[in-house]
């Protein structure tokens, strides 16, 4: 249940992806429902109180908490739609998959489902009538969730307002539009093992492992995939790519992962979307807003403890940047970036993040930085950080060459070291994002 995107056979966008963002300058509002029936906000549904007199109040409250931990809203909320009603288009390499309606509407949602059918969907990827569900629904991770927790999630979903809405039909390339092929995918790649605690580890570590590898489904985004959308062997949490964003490495690699982050740093990031190292944008903004800001301090810390125990990914050698690109990039940075991030790249703590030794900026694949500069982003909001700040798009102002140069400069300044950015890659991404081109190229004034 996460906001995804370009995942292979469409594995969902990772719930606990740590996406570091380079800056924020303008306020942006979260999309609001288009219909009066949606007066209850997604955050309101996640914080709603339940009467203790109800026979299953404790189970429903637990389900409400687990739905937040699984970040269900981020995927099952389309722009302008009602929470949990689905209809969000997941842009996968194989076509579009639309998320389902999981409100208790009997005709278009899951109101006619039994708890057994719901468990089978979560555990085996099977629909109400036994049909195979596409792995855009991350059952490869949810199958590790206990039956007790699945039943609690189902109990909470049954308390939601029923929304009569049918999402559009999927638009997948032949032959992937035949669900029978998913069965073959499951045979090849689906891990049949349920979650097992490690007796050699602490209770806190095991709780973190349960969340990261189960409801949190972090690997859906942060583990690289093969051509069929399955996890690459022995590369858990070493970074992935989806919907023209990069989900960074979450291992202990000190340059491109979480090696320089403490347990407290990770927990703070999950609570507020900001810490001394980074701020959450892209798909991670929704994870903060609808998921990790709602879970307990203890669970955020458990996740952090587990992530800090992951072995570092292999080091990646970076080629030296061209001196001309660095010189041009420095000039562009001074004009377009330094007002927020300062000339020395230190930014302003927990407002405009520092750019030096930034893991996301040094990822082997620079698509995330290119996307950030071209399209801008918003930061996730939370109770502790309610201001909906964002970084504006520079597509209107900077040419592809200028974006390549300033990206190369940022990726190789203040202790950073990463491969140069190719102008052809920026041009290709601009086309994919359908962003305007710049009319002038001197970068000396209004365009």
Language-model segments: what does each one mean?
Residues 45-73:
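Short extracytoplasmic
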Residues 330-371, 387:
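C-terminal structural cap/anchor segments
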Residues 32-50, 77-97, 128-209, 213-214, ...:
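Flexible coil segments in periplasmic/lumen-exposed cytochrome c-class electron-transfer proteins
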Residues 108-126, 130, 259-263:
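Aromatic- and charge-enriched surface segment that lines or borders ligand/interaction sites
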Residues 270, 291, 356-405:
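Extended, polar beta-sheet/loop recognition surfaces of beta-rich domains
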Residues 2-39:
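N-terminal type II signal-anchor transmembrane helix
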Residues 124-127, 272-276, 375:
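Glycine-rich, acidic and aromatic/proline-enriched surface loops and short helix-turn segments
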């Amino acid at each position: 249940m996460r906001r995804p995107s370009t995942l292979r056979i469409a594995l969902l966008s990772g719930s606990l992806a740590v996406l570091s963002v380079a800056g924020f300058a303008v306020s942006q509002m979260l999309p609001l429902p288009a219909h009066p029936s949606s007066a209850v906000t997604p955050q309101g549904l996640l914080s709603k109180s339940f009467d203790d007199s109800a026979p299953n109040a404790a189970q429903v409250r637990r389900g409400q908490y687990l739905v937040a931990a699984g970040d269900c809203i981020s995927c099952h909320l389309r722009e302008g739609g009602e929470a949990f009603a689905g209809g969000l288009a997941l842009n996968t390499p194989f076509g579009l998959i639309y998320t389902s309606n999981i409100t208790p509407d009997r005709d278009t949602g899951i109101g006619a489902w039994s708890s057994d059918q719901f468990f089978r969907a979560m555990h085996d990827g099977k629909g109400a009538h036994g049909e195979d569900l596409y792995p855009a629904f991350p059952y490869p991770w949810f199958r590790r969730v206990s039956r007790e927790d699945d039943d609690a999630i189902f109990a909470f979903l049954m308390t939601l307002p029923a929304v009569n809405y049918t999402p559009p039909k999927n638009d997948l390339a032949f032959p992937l539009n035949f669900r029978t092929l998913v069965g073959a995918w499951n045979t090849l790649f689906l891990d049949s093992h349920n979650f097992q605690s490690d007796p050699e580890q602490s209770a806190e570590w095991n709780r973190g492992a349960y969340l990261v590898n189960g409801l949190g489904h972090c690997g859906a985004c942060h583990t690289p995939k093969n051509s069929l959308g399955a996890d690459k062997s022995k590369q858990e949490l070493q970074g992935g790519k989806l919907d023209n964003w990069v989900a960074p490495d979450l291992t202990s690699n000190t340059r491109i992962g979480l090696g320089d982050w403490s347990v407290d740093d990770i927990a703070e990031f999950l609570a507020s979307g900001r810490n001394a190292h980074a701020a959450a944008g892209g798909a991670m903004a929704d994870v903060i807003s609808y998921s990790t800001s709602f879970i307990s301090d203890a669970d955020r810390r458990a996740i952090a403890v587990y992530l800090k125990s992951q072995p570092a990914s292999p080091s990646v050698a970076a080629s030296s940047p061209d001196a001309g690109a660095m010189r041009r990039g420095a000039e562009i940075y001074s004009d377009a970036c330094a007002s927020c991030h300062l000339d020395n790249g230190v930014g302003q703590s927990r407002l405009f993040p520092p750019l030096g030794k930034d893991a996301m900026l040094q990822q082997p694949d620079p698509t995330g930085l290119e996307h950030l500069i071209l399209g801008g982003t918003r930061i996730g909001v939370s109770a502790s950080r309610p201001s909906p700040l964002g970084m504006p798009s520079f597509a209107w102002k900077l040419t592809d060459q200028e974006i390549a140069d300033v990206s190369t400069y940022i990726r190789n300044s203040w202790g950073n070291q990463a491969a140069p950015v190719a102008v052809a890659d920026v041009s290709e991404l601009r086309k994919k994002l359908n962003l305007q081109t710049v009319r002038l190229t001197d970068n000396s004034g209004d365009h």
